[in-house]
Amino acid sequence: ILRGAGSPTRSEGGLLAYLSKLRDAKVLVIDDSNTIRRSAEIFLVQAGCQVVLAEDGFDALAKIADHQPKVIFCDIMMPRLDGYQTCSLIKKNPRFKATPVIMLSSKDGLFDRARGRMVGSDQYLTKPFTKDSLLQTVATFVLPSASETS
């Protein structure tokens, strides 16, 4: 588990190993809010990830084939093509069906989570997110699970 800067960890080596596994993971962040995009970019770049930013679903669909991200964060409430439609289009494409899509929303309702699952999202993250929650979410999908490493 990642902790905030200056917090004690079980082992500094363990933390460094954890962060090194995130290094070079390519992450696409789709959000119409420049503040959210920039916050996510700062947190992810600090962890060594490569970050691709998109302002809306159409922008994301144009970039996904070129960049082939390992993980996609997708805001629900966006103009033109909302997050549900964007996620659905990504998951219907055989090339990107296996790419994890994490829905971002300022609402933490059961309906929003269920609707996200219905269009194929893999997880749901409530905004505002913390650095730790963002990196742990990426790690969930990028790092091998304990069963794969045993």
Where in the sequence are the language-model features?
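Active-site beta3 strand of CheY-like receiver
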Residues: 67-73
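Short hydrophobic/Thr-rich beta-strand motif most characteristic of the beta2 strand and flanking loop
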Residues: 48-55, 63
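Charged docking surfaces used in two-component/phosphorelay signaling
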Residues: 38-46
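Receiver (REC) domain active-site loop signature in two-component systems and cognate sites
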Residues: 78
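C-terminal output helix
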Residues: 129-138
